[in-house]
């Protein structure tokens, strides 16, 4: 089987890094097309031996990208096309059908109740999504929570498959030596209690809540923010105004999978933390929380379907927090008062092993490879 994965961009992000990890475990010959931004993850995929094509799309309405994408699919002789993220799902499904491929699947990585990929959901976005969804044979939801959102949108339940995001458990196994070295490298005091936040620095992630929570905690508490994004300068200013700028560290974008770049990777940074806090109120999965649990960290979160969809005993060190900075400050103080626990991965982390996710996806591939009636692009346009 030859498969083509089409994704909107390949900068450092959850969906992008998940694609790279997945391709390491899929027993399928895969190429990747990125519509825009062939960033750090594109370099990582190339280092893994994956062929990456940059389509050079200039914007959402660059219709010249469609015939170029059709040509790439035809020339590649692909049996299956798998799309990721909104723009790639719109253009990728249509291009695959025009190129004669019928085995089409899309993964819905980031559908929230009120936003998708950090943007507000409107009637136009939903209508276009549903029209293009009909061109494929299946839509993969990364959690039962997202599957429920898709059903409420109007995607027929038989077309939805749940394939959770996966993690490389061995990659996140706690290493006390790496913890010590990373904390030294970051210049952290030996007695620092380190609160971690991981993710794109965007307004929707609400990392400002953690900055304000830090201001309510004793002076030996530090905040380590792992990720890059447009809100970094805003967060720096917020930290300065709150009087905690000297206790907030920004690492910038860090790879989840080793890519040879200098500086500590995500696992080492998780080892350096004492607790992970995730104040984002609307998540589709909560990959950062699961990775933190795999590193043996206690977690305080506002939203995490990956944990909420499992029995409570699966992640005893994970607690949901309702409220803003005051609530997080109390929850983090309670986490510290509980004292350190063995840094072992709970059942929830094992549930999300990447091998299991890859096996589930292969089952989806096998199902959609079986011919079944589905509408043509012309039929969808007419409807």
Where are these regions (language model features)?
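Short alpha-helical donor nucleotide-sugar binding micro-motif in glycosyltransferases
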Residues: 73, 253-254, 259-264, 268-273
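N-terminal strand-loop element at the rim of the active site
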Residues: 5-64, 149, 229-230
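Aromatic "clamp/platform" in nucleotide-sugar-dependent glycosyltransferases that forms part
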Residues: 281
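Short hydrophobic beta-strand element within catalytic cores of glycosyltransferases
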Residues: 34, 298-302
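Nucleotide-sugar donor phosphate/pyrophosphate-binding loop at the beta->alpha transition
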Residues: 63-67, 102-105, 112-135, 148
């Amino acid at each position: 089987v030859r498969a083509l994965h089409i994704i909107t961009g390949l900068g450092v992000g959850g969906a992008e890094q998940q694609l790279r990890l997945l391709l390491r475990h899929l027993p399928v010959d895969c190429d990747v097309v990125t519509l825009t931004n062939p960033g750090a993850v594109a370099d990582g995929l190339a280092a893994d031996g994956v062929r990456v094509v940059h389509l050079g799309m200039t914007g959402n309405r660059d219709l010249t990208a469609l015939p170029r994408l059709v040509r790439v699919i035809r020339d590649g002789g692909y049996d299956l096309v798998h799309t990721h993220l909104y723009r790639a799902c719109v253009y990728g499904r249509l291009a695959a059908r025009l190129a004669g491929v019928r085995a089409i699947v899309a993964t819905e990585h980031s559908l929230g109740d009120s936003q998708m990929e950090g943007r507000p959901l409107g009637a136009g976005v939903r209508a276009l999504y549903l029209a293009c969804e009909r061109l494929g044979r299946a839509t993969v939801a990364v959690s039962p929570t997202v599957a429920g959102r898709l059903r409420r949108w109007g995607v027929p339940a038989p077309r939805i498959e749940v394939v959770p995001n996966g993690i490389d458990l061995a990659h996140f196994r706690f290493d006390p030596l790496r913890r010590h070295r990373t904390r030294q490298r970051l210049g952290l005091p030996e007695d620092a209690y380190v609160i971690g936040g991981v993710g794109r620095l965007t307004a929707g992630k609400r990392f400002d809540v953690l900055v304000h929570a830090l201001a309510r905690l004793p002076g030996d508490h530090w905040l380590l923010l792992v990720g890059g994004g447009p809100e970094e300068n805003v967060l720096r200013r917020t930290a300065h105004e709150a009087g905690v700028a000297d206790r907030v560290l920004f690492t910038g974008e860090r790879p989840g999978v080793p890519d040879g770049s200098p500086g500590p990777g995500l696992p080492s940074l998780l080892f350096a933390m004492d607790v992970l806090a995730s104040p984002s109120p609307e998540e589709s999965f909560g990959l950062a929380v699961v990775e933190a649990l795999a590193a043996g960290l206690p977690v305080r979160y506002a939203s995490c379907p990956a944990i909420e969809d499992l029995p409570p005993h699966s992640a005893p060190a994970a607690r949901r927090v309702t409220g803003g900075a005051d609530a997080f400050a109390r929850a983090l103080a309670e986490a510290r008062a509980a004292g350190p626990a063995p840094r072992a991965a709970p059942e929830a982390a094992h549930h999300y092993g990447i091998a299991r996710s890859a096996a589930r996806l292969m089952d989806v591939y096998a199902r959609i490879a079986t011919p079944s009636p589905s509408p043509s692009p012309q039929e969808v346009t007419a409807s």
